[in-house]
């Protein structure tokens, strides 16, 4: 289940005529070529045949490697925003498909609502959940989501749960 929080990173986009994709703000430990937002901008630019570029400015308010989808939501925001800025004309479904190549949880952020996810994150069923309270803790270490899910020691024998079981509280 993906539940959205009323907290997130702040992103700004400035179009460029020279076709370059650049960051206006440094992110310690994340070179531009590994930044999901930069990668999302480059992916959209290539997929839509866009000649313009963009300067991205990101103020991180969510912890890096904290497991709350900060990088994925930034990538999704980049796809949706630059699709508008560049007038690329892609649908949300097309943007979500592009986002899936960046990370399994990018599509849910492209669609922008709470959802039950199946598959690797691309099969989404919208949910209306009660408005709970959340506490976001900032860990003293960062963990790459991809590394966790690709680790051979990850337990993969959990029984599947259905959306009906989840909604029933089972």
Regions found by a protein language model. Give the residues of each.
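Contiguous, small/hydrophobic- and glycine-enriched helical/loop subdomains that border
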Residues: 75, 79-117
């Amino acid at each position: 289940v993906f539940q959205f929080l009323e907290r997130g990173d702040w992103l700004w986009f400035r179009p460029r005529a020279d076709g370059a994709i650049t960051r206006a703000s440094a992110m310690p430990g994340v070179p531009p070529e590994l930044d999901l937002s930069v990668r999302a901008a480059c992916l959209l630019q290539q997929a839509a045949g866009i000649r313009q570029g963009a300067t991205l400015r990101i103020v991180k308010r969510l912890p890096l490697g904290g497991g709350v989808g900060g990088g994925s939501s930034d990538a999704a925001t980049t796809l949706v925003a630059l699709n508008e800025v560049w007038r690329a004309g892609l649908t949300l479904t097309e943007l979500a498909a592009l986002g899936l190549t960046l990370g399994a949880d990018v599509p849910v952020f492209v669609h922008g609502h709470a959802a039950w996810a199946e598959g690797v994150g691309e099969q989404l069923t919208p949910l209306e959940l009660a408005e709970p309270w959340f506490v976001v803790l900032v860990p003293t270490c960062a963990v790459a989501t991809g590394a966790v899910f690709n680790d051979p020691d990850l337990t993969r024998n959990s029984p599947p749960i259905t959306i009906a079981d989840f909604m029933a509280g089972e």
